[in-house]
């Protein structure tokens, strides 16, 4: 973690608006009407080439459909004036388990100037929905290496997978939702400074490590809106990984006003009894944190929690965290 945080055809204004909501458990094996098509028999061979063909000036909704396959590239979605939906081919939209589209690369901060530029997907446009895509950073242990850099408001990721080791997801700005998705990592693998992020029905897979941290929220003042809520999710060792009991913490404070809640979440014994950890011994950063839990279950939810954490008397709601208008941009069919 460094202090600096330094995806068919372009739709015309008269084109049919891209669909933005699909019923869970429906298949999606061909491009929705009006979408740019990547891979298979589509016009575009890379995801980035389809992204580059999007209109930067149109306000009509746009979409991209990606055929099954592995795409070895880094993708940057610049700010658009329209809503954008990116679909991955799948026979089951309700889950990440049947995903057939993977975007993967291995940049890290060893060869990029900041966290954002290491990400497999650099998502800088607001009003973005991403469905059933696996985002992977293969760098592994040793450096910051992101699968996703989410840098804009009203972004939703549904039935996706995010895999990395350190700093897997940068939830940096705006309001964001991650639902029915899989997130994997070891060190600070959900982190950022200003975003309000709601994680719903997600599986968090932790990798083999002597010690690990799921979140590292960098909220730096009482006026900073940042808030991470992990709701109705599961925490366990990632498939194929052996993780010692108590090796992982729910989070540590990147900044003093760090704010994270885990609620109604199943935790295996990989979670330490203390739950939460100081940033480091000489610089704890716990004086203004909000670290809380409600109705969690499993062996990892038991024990004496850190003195700077608390228990809530009721669960937080999406409207409380994301705002009363959240259903205007969130695909609520994916929420618990």
Locations of regions flagged by a protein language model:
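Sequence-level preference for short, compositionally simple segments enriched
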Residues: 19-336
């Amino acid at each position: 973690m460094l202090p600096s945080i330094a995806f068919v055809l372009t739709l015309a204004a008269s084109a049919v608006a891209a669909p933005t909501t699909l019923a869970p458990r429906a298949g999606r094996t061909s491009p929705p009407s009006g979408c740019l098509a990547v891979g298979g028999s589509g016009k575009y061979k890379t995801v980035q080439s389809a992204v580059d063909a999007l209109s930067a000036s149109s306000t009509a909704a746009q979409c991209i459909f990606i055929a099954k396959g592995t795409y070895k590239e880094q993708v940057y979605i610049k700010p658009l004036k329209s809503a954008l939906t990116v679909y991955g081919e799948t026979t089951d939209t309700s889950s990440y388990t049947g995903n057939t589209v993977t975007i993967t690369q291995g940049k890290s901060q060893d060869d990029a100037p900041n966290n954002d530029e290491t990400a497999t997907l650099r998502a800088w446009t607001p009003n973005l929905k991403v469905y059933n895509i696996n985002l992977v950073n293969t760098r592994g242990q040793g450096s910051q290496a992101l699968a996703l850099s989410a840098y804009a408001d009203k972004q939703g990721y549904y039935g996706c997978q995010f895999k990395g080791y350190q700093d897997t997801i940068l939830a940096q700005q705006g309001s964001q939702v991650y639902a029915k998705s899989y997130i994997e990592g070891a060190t600070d693998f959900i982190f950022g400074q200003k975003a309000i992020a709601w994680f719903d029905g997600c599986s968090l897979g932790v990798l083999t490590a002597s010690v690990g941290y799921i979140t590292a929220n960098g909220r730096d003042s009482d006026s900073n809106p940042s808030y991470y809520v992990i709701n109705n999710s599961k925490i366990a060792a990632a498939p194929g990984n052996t993780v010692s009991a108590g090796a992982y913490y729910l989070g540590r404070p990147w900044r003093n006003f760090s704010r994270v809640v885990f609620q109604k979440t199943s935790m295996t014994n990989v979670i330490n009894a203390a739950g939460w950890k100081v940033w480091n011994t000489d610089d704890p950063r716990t004086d203004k944190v909000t670290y809380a839990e409600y109705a969690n279950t499993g062996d990892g939810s038991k024990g004496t929690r850190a003195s700077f954490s608390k228990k809530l008397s009721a669960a937080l709601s999406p409207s409380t965290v994301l705002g009363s208008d959240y259903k205007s941009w969130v695909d609520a069919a994916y929420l618990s």
